[in-house]
Amino acid sequence: MGTAAAAAAAGEGARGPSPAAVSLGLGVAVVSSLVNGSTFVLQKKGIVRAKRRGTSYLTDIVWWAGTIAMAVGQIGNFLAYTAVPTVLVTPLGALGVPFGSILASYLLKEKLNILGKLGCLLSCAGSVVLIIHSPKSESVTTQAELEEKLTNPVFVGYLCIVLLMLLLLIFWIAPAHGPTNIMVYISICSLLGSFTVPSTKGIGLAAQDILHNNPSSQRALCLCLVLLAVLGCSIIVQFRYINKALECFDSSVFGAIYYVVFTTLVLLASAILFREWSNVGLVDFLGMACGFTTVSVGIVLIQVFKEFNFNLGEMNKSNMKTD
């Protein structure tokens, strides 16, 4: 009896989507990360073209292509978040960093040397490790559970801290230091991820009750509308500051740093709200830490050494001189 009860409890605490849903969600997440990786490059290209002509980037077709790609990528992320845990989807954004760097080397003529290519390989390898070790089960699967989590004092306190930091950054720090310090705009966009990603996940959960016409569908509808409003406001502010950053800084540098900071803050918010780490063992936790570290090292190689004129030909010449 005790064993059966324990097994039942374990099954209830580790509910998750079917393997087919996980595979579909992963596929959508991978495609979305690649699409998102192209958005910053296309938008930057449009901004550069508009500056060259002396017109607004709002009139440039390439900028609009990047904006549409961003919308498509966000829709893909929304679908992925409804199928698999947040902690599995968010780190896969790493795939967009090397893809964006390769695209930028062609469209924006940004440098990508041998170390940058090695960084692309490490980012992809780290993403595979993250997929293998990420939790596949959900800890919050109903609208009632979501409401309980949203009113948790720890999560409410975290959101209040994030909101205060955003107000400080937007109204005091950004006007003075935003154009010269890339971390200001990145911090604003990343902190907003504490609202956008949980809201996206919550909308998916609330929508299930609405579509199935459950007795709590009225409450679910109200919750869904509130989360939609939060999501909409967050995306608008994010969009504004992403374009401000692209006007002032290198697109691939912004994309790389943004990935690391955004992923860290989103995983923190998701850990507090959804408790998706509760079903992760020590081995998988260490595996995810190693995967995220590998991705971060790859991103550093792509960006920090991009100005070095370093290639295989020069390595061979150096070896010949040494011999």
UniProtKB/Swiss-Prot annotation:
Regions crossing the membrane: 22-42, 61-81, 83-103, 112-132, 154-174, 178-198, 219-239, 254-274, 285-305
One Pfam match: Mg_trans_NIPA
Induction or repression: Up-regulated by low magnesium ion levels.
Places the protein is found: Cell membrane; Early endosome
GO molecular function per UniProt: magnesium ion transmembrane transporter activity
All ranges on the Cytoplasmic side of the membrane: 43-60, 104-111, 175-177, 240-253, 306-323
Family statement drawn from the similarity comment of this UniProt entry: Belongs to the NIPA family.
Function statement: Acts as a Mg(2+) transporter. Can also transport other divalent cations such as Fe(2+), Sr(2+), Ba(2+), Zn(2+) and Co(2+) but to a much less extent than Mg(2+).
Protein name as catalogued: Magnesium transporter NIPA1
Organism listed in the record: Mus musculus (Mouse)
Designated gene of the protein: Nipa1
